[in-house]
């Protein structure tokens, strides 16, 4: 009971401070802070699932966040037809080659598990694949990046509503977490933390330097919104009437009609910004509430009790027949997928994707401070 009261008091103080910002500065700034808090809360839920449920330390939050942001770009931006004509098919061929290399290596590991030549065969496949990839991708990338580099210079995306990117971002981050988990989850806690941090830096480096995919440090701007634009709201009669009705008292104090119209116009501009951020806050609140309900249900389910048992004593859980490695991998993927959702939410809110802005202090260690 005492803990519940402390939690309620903490959230009440935070909400009070946000309201105070609204009164003393502006409601637009207060709602911006609220939206960023909600996005950070989603990231924290993802990290807390890994640490609180399974005792896994993941310092790669920045990388999963960036993948979520990349998903927003690849889903919402329209395809650049000229870039696809210049080298899109070649890049698809490169993706097919990579997929084929993975299948061949997996087949070699299965068929030549006891052969002394297994490693030589795998090395030959990798070297041959990399040479082939280089020969095909280099001219294709050069051609793609030469297509109107000031505004495009990349393949673009699918042109779908950006809300779909929240799901795609979860799959991107979860897929990377699956690969990392297969390799690194057997490491000791401190080595796992270092490995995940380094892999996240690699992800950021790839996104920053592969212009054909994400425009790199040239950034992607003007992403689609799931809410109305301010300029559109300012021309809507229903919105103008709503603002006029809400501020009727202050407008009635102005006797001059010209001044009243100018005051109303300024109020409409300010209110449009507040309305848009209220819409974003509503969307983000729904996501946070759904995640909190699902995670709480999972925590007190038989599966949640099993995860806590594994966290407290892996040896005992393993002796009771629980697959510790499998459950660790599952929780690692789930937590990372939630962080990927948060990354897509952030790019959706900002309306732009800036790979150069991803820093460990903001997107990893600050989130861990919130978890702790």
Task: Please name every model-derived segment.
Residues 1-372:
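Transmembrane alpha-helices and adjacent helix-loop boundaries
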């Amino acid at each position: 009971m005492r803990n519940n009261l402390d939690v309620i008091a903490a959230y009440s103080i935070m909400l009070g401070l946000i309201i105070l910002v609204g009164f003393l500065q502006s409601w637009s700034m207060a709602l911006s802070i609220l939206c960023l808090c909600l996005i950070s809360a989603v990231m924290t839920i993802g990290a807390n699932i890994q640490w609180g449920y399974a005792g896994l330390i993941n310092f790669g939050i920045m990388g999963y966040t960036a993948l979520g942001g990349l998903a927003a770009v690849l889903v919402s931006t329209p395809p650049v037809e000229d870039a696809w004509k210049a080298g899109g098919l070649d890049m698809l061929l490169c993706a097919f080659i990579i997929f084929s290399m993975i299948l061949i290596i997996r087949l070699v590991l299965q068929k030549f598990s006891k052969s002394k030549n297994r490693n030589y065969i795998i090395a030959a496949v990798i070297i041959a694949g990399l040479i082939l990839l280089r020969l095909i991708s280099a001219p294709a990338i050069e051609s793609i990046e030469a297509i109107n580099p000031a505004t495009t210079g990349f393949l673009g995306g699918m042109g779908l509503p950006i809300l779909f990117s929240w799901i795609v971002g979860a799959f991107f981050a979860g897929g990377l977490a699956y690969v990392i988990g297969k390799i690194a989850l057997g490491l000791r806690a401190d080595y796992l933390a270092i490995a995940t941090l380094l892999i996240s830096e690699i992800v950021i480096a790839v996104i920053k330097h592969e212009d054909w995919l994400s425009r790199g440090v040239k950034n992607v701007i003007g992403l689609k919104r799931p809410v109305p634009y301010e300029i559109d709201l300012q021309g809507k009669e229903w919105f103008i009437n709503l603002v006029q009705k809400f501020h009727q008292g202050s407008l009635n104090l102005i006797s001059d009609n010209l001044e009243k119209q100018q005051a109303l116009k300024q109020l409409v501009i300010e209110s449009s910004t507040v309305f848009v951020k209220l819409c974003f806050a509503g969307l983000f609140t729904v996501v946070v509430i759904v995640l909190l309900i699902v995670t709480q249900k999972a925590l007190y389910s038989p599966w949640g009790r099993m995860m806590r048992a594994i966290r407290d004593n892996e040896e005992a859980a393993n002796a009771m027949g629980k697959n510790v490695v499998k459950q660790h991998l599952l929780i690692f993927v789930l937590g990372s997928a939630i962080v990927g959702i948060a990354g897509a939410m952030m790019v959706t809110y900002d309306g732009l994707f800036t790979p150069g802005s991803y820093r460990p202090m903001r997107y990893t260690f600050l989130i861990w401070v919130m978890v702790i």
